[in-house]
UniProtKB/Swiss-Prot annotation:
PANTHER family: NADPH-DEPENDENT ALKENAL/ONE OXIDOREDUCTASE, CHLOROPLASTIC, NADPH-DEPENDENT ALKENAL_ONE OXIDOREDUCTASE, CHLOROPLASTIC. InterPro entries: ADH-like_N, AOR-like, GroES-like_sf, NAD(P)-bd_dom_sf, PKS_ER, Quin_OxRdtase/zeta-crystal_CS. NADP(+) binds at K125, G240, V241, S263, T264, G265, K266, Y281, F330, V331, V332, R377, A378. It comes from Solanum lycopersicum (Tomato). CDD domains: MDR_like_2. One of its GO terms (molecular function) is furaneol oxidoreductase activity. This is 2-methylene-furan-3-one reductase.
Amino acid sequence: MEALLSSTTLQLKPLHPPSSFSSLHSPFSSISVLRVKGSKKAETFIQRSNFSTVLPLRVSASSQAAAAETSTSISIPSEMKAWSYTDYGSVDVLKLESNVAVPDIKEDQVLIKIVAAALNPVDFKRRLGKFKATDSPLPTVPGYDVAGVVVKVGSQVKGLKEGDEVYGDIHEKALDGPKQFGSLAEYTAVEEKLVALKPKNLSFAEAAALPLAIETAYEGLEKAGFSSGKSILVLGGAGGVGSLVIQLAKHVFGASKVAATSSTGKLELLKSLGADLAIDYTKENFEDLPDKFDVVYDSVGQGEKAVKVVKEGGSVVVLTGAVTPPGFRFVVTSNGEMLKKLNPYLESGKVKPVIDPKGPFSFDKVVDAFSYLETGRATGKVVIHPIP
């Protein structure tokens, strides 16, 4: 940490999040919370490590819970098409399989016929084997974000029925044993509590672009203590998370001022999302701005610079970066209740998904979609649609 703020002697103490944070957890990664104390100021750092199903191609009986006793009026095949990998590695390990077993559901789950999915950095980092220690066994069908139609419900499911159009992040814990069955398939099984009814005004492709990114954006703002009347600087405002941070800060939390950075060609997008100040990082250094901000939300990994523009006592949310002891780590979780909470803002159009103009990518172009995502140049989300 001395390298991060070389002019300041730092003392780190772990923060214990208030109980009010427990209800709306982000599935994006684990979060570490550090309080940094200097001689003149204190900032709070929330650092995230970006981290991403059965192929029973076959899963042993011990690895799957007994299927729920359910019935369905919808015809469901025994096998499906799905993208999978049996070894960790580059995009070359991804294979499109046509005889993957459709997953069974547990009593608290629904089976979703997937219409659209979206990719996140966690997906390719998981594929690269960054999280082997806590990953589910190979083979893996990747994918977190999903939008589709419920075709079967478990015996304990109360709030959803066959035919409901839903969306969500299917992995309750992003890093701790995520499912083998992800969303890059024709079907997936997911707990009822992790999904919500799709906003009526959104297409399946638009809905699939939201879950992981909007939960990450909302969670970061909440944990940073952001509230009405505060100012925020968003680094990487045109990305999947950054584009939603701008909108949530402005239209949900009531920010007094929203500034954001992007390349030259994306400045108008920032303004359309609600940014009061759009900064071209190819021509300007945001750390030279005359004003400081209550919160800096760093989605691109510029923590050293971010701390230079935060107010005394302000907060910095960082989506990339190592945890420095004695900071502690805890795993955040997906929660459909948060999606329900944001539904009015989505259906009113105050908060909108941003889909990269190169997409949506068709289901047979998943390798191209991964390759594009890994360039780091995507605007908004990389979406896969339709999924046959």
